[in-house]
Amino acid sequence: VYSIIRGVNGTLRAGSDQLYQWFPGEQGDGSGSVKEMRLAAALNGAFGDHLEDSGNVLAIPMTLVVSGEVIGPEKSALARRLPRASAHPVVFVHGLGLSEHSWNPRGEAGIGEYLDQELDVTPVYLRYNTGRHISTNGRELAELLGRLCANWPVPVESLTLVGHSMGGLVIRSACWYAEQAEAHWLESLKNVLCLGTPHHGSPLEKAGHVLDLALRRIPHANPMAVGRARSAGIKDLRYGNLLDEDWSEQDSGRFEPDARRLVPMLEGVNYYFAAATVGPNEKVLSGKLLGDLLVRLGSATGKHRDELRALHIDPQNCRVFFEKNHFDLLSDEAVH
């Protein structure tokens, strides 16, 4: 997925308008194979903002998925699809360029099924366009969760949100916008789990931005400006933008410092952070520099040199997994 995203350029972006012919069904109707959905998800991660702006059928709408079936948040749809729903829904939010299939990458039972068997919970998966701004997805998720909780087949006693990578940022954004709107579903929110979430950005996006700025200064290199073709969602990962204000006032043609608004964690909600490193411990240089190959430990655990930006989480709720990579957090039994 990430090799596709890093390699995208303007030519591929324009050509995406014709790719819909490869797919037998529209993305919003839940048709098509797992392979096709994974390809569409990768394309959305790469330039989903362009797909949406151009009205392309490949632009993935935000939907809920249960047992592989797209369902609406209406009371009748939820009751029909979830006749044995528990009072404890768990919503899984995938990361950049992925889909709900990322939670069981080998086609086997994943963390959602595991929790369903071991605990009295009902897993629900979010599918969304990861190329859009995180704040755009956050606002829409906040509204969708409101409808989900209001129309859940039984009264919701506890809501748990689980986000992998970008998914954790979308969750935190949704919580912010819901709090501003005094949304009722926040009363049910008890737990937020972030797996490999770049709370303070990803070094890969920072490097992509530097490359873009460098190419702009080289004569005749403009047509090769791969970095400029990055989607809005990818650009948000530079610092971990959560709000509209974090990106709307930024000049993409300049290197600007981190100017994000402070978004504290919600009071009364239990937060859990899981991070990974390819190193055998936190002191090894490879682990410090590479983290899980996409997100460094400090970012995934919420640490920051600026105490105002640091996310102070209970140490008992923060876990580091050694000799694991970014995607091991999705399927490794030790993480589950």
Per-range role (PLM):
Residues 1-126, 136, 151:
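Flexible, membrane-associating and regulatory peripheral segments of lipid-active enzymes
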Residues 32-36, 40, 48-51, 176-336:
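Helical cap/lid subdomain of alpha/beta-hydrolase-fold lipid enzymes
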Residues 67-80, 106, 144-149, 243-263:
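A Trp-anchored, charged/polar loop motif used as the substrate-binding/catalytic surface
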Residues 91-95, 164-165, 196, 292:
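The conserved beta1-alpha1 loop
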Residues 103-106, 136-139, 175-176, 206-207:
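Short coil/turn segments at secondary-structure boundaries
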Residues 132-151:
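Alpha/beta-hydrolase active-site loop
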Residues 153-164:
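Alpha/beta-hydrolase fold nucleophile elbow
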Residues 162-176, 200:
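Glycine-rich nucleophile elbow surrounding the catalytic serine of serine-hydrolase chemistry
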